[in-house]
């Protein structure tokens, strides 16, 4: 199981970065680096590997357009929260607040930084890893509830 987060940056030429997280390791793929394409395409196409994220419809379309491969095995946490009764779109920050009653701080500087840069800064790498890991924690916490697991399996 992996968490999928895309960083698009300020320009509309993204996505530039895809980050995945397991419970122990974050993986950050720079999409402008051709060396990252083969392992990334394998992960995206593998239906047996769950990719967790928020509001993934547009991300899947962007990846399909960029690589010509339909990403499979996605679990969209926004859809789970909607089925749980939340009317507004729930993103990562709101999900952390709902599930853990904690604030998830995101650096505005890192959010708005140049994700298309050939070399990412340490703050960008930390931001990307934290984003993916926080989403994984939300999913794992929700997965402890049998009713929510039923919702996940229906989607």
Language-model region placement:
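Short hydrophobic beta-strand that contains or immediately precedes a catalytic carboxylate
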Residues: 1-5
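Conserved DEDDh/DEDDy metal-dependent 3′-5′ exonuclease domain
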Residues: 6-141
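Acidic two-metal-ion nuclease catalytic site recognized across multiple nuclease folds
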Residues: 134-155
């Amino acid at each position: 199981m992996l968490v999928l987060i895309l960083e698009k940056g300020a320009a509309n030429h993204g996505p530039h970065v895809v980050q995945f997280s397991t419970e122990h390791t974050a993986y950050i793929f720079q999409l402008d680096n051709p060396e990252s394409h083969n392992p990334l395409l394998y992960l995206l196409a593998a239906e047996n590997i769950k990719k967790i994220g928020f509001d993934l419809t547009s991300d899947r379309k962007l990846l399909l357009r960029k690589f010509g491969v339909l990403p499979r095995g996605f679990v969209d946490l926004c859809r789970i929260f909607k089925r749980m009764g939340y009317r507004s779109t729930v993103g990562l920050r709101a999900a952390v607040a709902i599930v853990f009653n904690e604030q998830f701080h995101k650096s505005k500087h890192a959010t708005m930084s140049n994700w298309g840069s050939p070399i990412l800064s340490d703050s960008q790498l930390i931001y990307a890893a934290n984003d993916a890991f926080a989403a994984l924690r939300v999913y794992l916490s929700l997965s402890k509830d049998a009713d929510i697991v039923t919702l996940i399996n229906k989607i």
